[in-house]
UniProtKB/Swiss-Prot annotation:
Annotated catalysed reactions: (5R,7aS)-5-hydroxy-7a-methyl-1-oxo-2,3,5,6,7,7a-hexahydro-1H-indene-carboxyl-CoA + NAD(+) = (7aS)-7a-methyl-1,5-dioxo-2,3,5,6,7,7a-hexahydro-1H-indene-carboxyl-CoA + NADH + H(+)
Source taxonomy: Bacteria, Bacillati, Actinomycetota, Actinomycetes, Mycobacteriales
GO MF annotation, one: oxidoreductase activity, acting on the CH-OH group of donors, NAD or NADP as acceptor
Gene: ipdF
Annotated active site: Y170 (proton acceptor)
Enzymatic class: oxidoreductase
Name used for this protein in its record: (5R,7aS)-5-hydroxy-7a-methyl-1-oxo-2,3,5,6,7,7a-hexahydro-1H-indene-carboxyl-CoA reductase
């Protein structure tokens, strides 16, 4: 694994100076680790979490080696309420505060409804939707008593809006993330908290490469105006904007990160 980055990717503008940012599902080379890297480049300290302990440690070490800010890591299974609560508690204990939560965890699959088991449906909904609820709840319980407000950014998907064969469980979960984003944003406003979501179309990462065929990936990429998938850092840049004070009048919004043909 190599987290080295191009200059245009790492160049920061201080958007998150002094902030503490938590990113879930941040092990490896996908959107989570790219978001942590972008947050560091923008002046934040970060806490990354994942249930893959070894990969999480490796990612934390490589992020730390960039020399951009403090990096902590917490092993966390987002399907466990106790572990999610502990993630937020550990962050505030170690870092002294929490400013931004990025809910990045998700799980997909390729199964038609007629062939899908209850367990498969439940697992995808738990990881991709209920985990967002768990972490949002834990963060809001902290933010409502904090004097500085906060930000939550959720990772949804264009499949929350669009139909795709064999993706009913994942699409339903991501549509739920969009609805949770909008509804919780109304509630959180009284705490000075903003909640938004990004909705990527197709972004390259190892999990996608393993679960989707080369033919499917090529077909999906061909549907983009640029004829390619997004790089994780391109999604992370939008997340950083939503986490920053430059989006201070945005809440309850779902921002599409795609270049779809009209």
């Amino acid at each position: 694994m190599n987290l080295s980055v191009a200059p245009k990717e790492i160049a920061g503008h201080g958007l998150l100076d002094g902030k503490v940012v938590v990113v879930t599902a941040a092990a490896g080379t996908g959107i989570g680790s790219a978001t942590a890297r972008r947050a560091l480049a923008e002046g934040a300290d970060v806490v990354i979490s994942d249930h893959h302990e070894r990969r999480l440690g490796e990612t934390a070490a490589e992020l730390s080696a960039l020399g951009l800010g403090r990096v902590e890591h917490v092993v966390c299974d987002v399907t466990s309420t106790a572990q999610v609560d502990a993630l937020i508690d550990s962050t505030t204990a170690r870092m002294g505060r929490l400013d931004v939560l990025v809910n990045n965890a998700g799980l997909g699959g390729q199964t038609p409804v007629a062939d899908m088991t209850d367990d498969e449906w439940d697992r995808v909904l738990d990881v991709s939707l209920t985990s967002v609820f768990r972490a949002t709840r834990a963060a809001l319980r902290y933010f409502r008593d904090a004097p500085h407000g906060g930000v939550i950014v959720n990772n949804a998907s264009v499949l929350g809006w669009r139909a795709q064969h064999s993706q009913s469980h994942y699409a339903a979960a991501k549509a739920g993330v969009m609805a949770l984003t909008r509804c919780s944003a109304i509630e959180a406003a009284e705490y000075g908290v903003r909640i938004n979501a990004v909705s990527p179309s197709i972004a390259r990462h190892k999990f996608l490469d393993k679960t989707a065929s080369a033919e499917l990936l090529d077909r999906l990429a061909a549907g983009e105006a640029f004829g390619r998938a997004a790089e994780p850092w391109e999604v992370a840049a939008t997340i950083a904007f939503l986490a920053s004070d430059y989006s201070s009048y945005l809440t309850g919004e779902v921002i599409s990160v795609s270049c779809q043909h009209p």
